[in-house]
Amino acid sequence: MAAQRRSLLQSEQQPSWTDDLPLCHLSGVGSASNRSYSADGKGTESHPPEDSWLKFRSENNCFLYGVFNGYDGNRVTNFVAQRLSAELLLGQLNAEHAEADVRRVLLQAFDVVERSFLESIDDALAEKASLQSQLPEGVPQHQLPPQYQKILERLKTLEREISGGAMAVVAVLLNNKLYVANVGTNRALLCKSTVDGLQVTQLNVDHTTENEDELFRLSQLGLDAGKIKQVGIICGQESTRRIGDYKVKYGYTDIDLLSAAKSKPIIAEPEIHGAQPLDGVTGFLVLMSEGLYKALEAAHGPGQANQEIAAMIDTEFAKQTSLDAVAQAVVDRVKRIHSDTFASGGERARFCPRHEDMTLLVRNFGYPLGEMSQPTPSPAPAAGGRVYPVSVPYSSAQSTSKTSVTLSLVMPSQGQMVNGAHSASTLDEATPTLTNQSPTLTLQSTNTHTQSSSSSSDGGLFRSRPAHSLPPGEDGRVEPYVDFAEFYRLWSVDHGEQSVVTAP
């Protein structure tokens, strides 16, 4: 096992070795690439995607999840995802380990990954130094004679290979206890279902220039914490902890803001939170990259992104039939909110000219999935046909919640028609307005599994169906509870009827 791990750490030629690791099917991932908007609202990708993620289950029933947010390229994020898996899933963790052992293994894993990456670029750094020594001193690059162009091109290639860094949030689930290790600005949330709603807790802290503990750490190294907080950015990033980024690791003495430091000010040492016991917990774990919550904060303002995203996930749990679909639906929704805010030209539009890559990982702990989804896919409409909705309320004696199921009838067209979709409410209407800004907050769940009425916003589409059997009327018939009114209305409109036919 040790030889296998050394082989993995020494080789850059096995980028897909983790394909052989079993995936965790109790989790799902959604993602979206970065976007910059032009004046006409069109979005284009500013750079290749730089996020990465992992969700594995080892043979000894240890679960590993991670979301990695890169910058200046994706080499570091890919490296970290590969090497952390090697450091944590090749026998280093097992059920006999105590909490202190797990924390020690996590600290050691991050240390090995950081050192391994910096060692992996040693040759490139040496070549860069050698090439730079061949250039005439004091001459700007754009003024160099043509014979130096090949050297300049090689230097640019080397710079791309060695530049960049990554932030990481990692979760380990072992012996039904949750551990979170964090470097940088990605976030981990634990969302628990309670009698009062959904309790949302951020498990880690953001390592930024706004973090008072981080500012104190930097001040102990001899740096001006007040100036760092005022500037807010260190070499292009708000984070005070990063993996990689050789410029701030090796060259911090040449950076005005960091030059007075007694030792490396930007570190890759993780803060570890846990163990968090999960016995009896119903809910879900959230790992998300900085790009996701920053995009939502840009559109809605700071302070409530955690709660809003948790509420969105809760809503999608009721609608989707897979965890990947849950995560992707939330990412798509945040992306749409951000885009719509920019296009609106409103007060928040100036904060939304672009967003970074967005990644969301959701791990389920027994939270009900797909209660509002149709049990089987609707049949595809025939060519040229149109879908007409028929609404049927659903009631279960085993649940006090009420869920609406919308069936679809496909009718042949008498000409060219565009398939229509009709919804009684928008996704955004399901998100509650929140005012509490504490790290732990209880939301009134939109996906209530005990007391809510999720069909209440559907208005007149649904007739109330009592739980008990209805007695027959004088004509021996039971009052219908299937409402065809919307079906007949749309049929009449499409076929040129002057009056809407009422349901029988």
Curated annotation (Swiss-Prot):
Residues 1-22, 430-478 are annotated as: Disordered. Changing F216A: Loss of interaction with XIAP. The modification Phosphoserine is found at S7, S378, S423, S438. The record marks F484 as: Required for interaction with MAP3K7. InterPro entries: PP2C, PPM-type-like_dom_sf, PPM-type_phosphatase-like_dom. Residues 440-457 have a biased composition (Low complexity). It is found in: Cytoplasm, Cytosol; Endoplasmic reticulum membrane. PROSITE patterns: PPM_2 (PS51746). Glycans are attached at S395. The modification Phosphothreonine is found at T431, T442. GO terms for molecular function: mitogen-activated protein kinase p38 binding; molecular adaptor activity; protein serine/threonine kinase activator activity; protein serine/threonine phosphatase activity; protein-containing complex binding. It is a peripheral membrane protein. PANTHER family: PROTEIN PHOSPHATASE 2C, TGF-BETA-ACTIVATED KINASE 1 AND MAP3K7-BINDING PROTEIN 1. Interacts with XIAP and BIRC7. Interacts with TRAF6 and MAP3K7; during IL-1 signaling. Identified in the TRIKA2 complex composed of MAP3K7, TAB1 and TAB2. Interacts with TRAF6 and MAPK14; these interactions allow MAPK14 autophosphorylation. Interacts with STING1; interaction takes place following cGAMP activation and promotes TAB1 recruitment to the endoplasmic reticulum, triggering MAP3K7/TAK1 activation and STING1 phosphorylation. Key adapter protein that plays an essential role in JNK and NF-kappa-B activation and proinflammatory cytokines production in response to stimulation with TLRs and cytokines. Mechanistically, associates with the catalytic domain of MAP3K7/TAK1 to trigger MAP3K7/TAK1 autophosphorylation leading to its full activation. Similarly, associates with MAPK14 and triggers its autophosphorylation and subsequent activation. In turn, MAPK14 phosphorylates TAB1 and inhibits MAP3K7/TAK1 activation in a feedback control mechanism. This is TGF-beta-activated kinase 1 and MAP3K7-binding protein 1. It comes from Homo sapiens (Human).
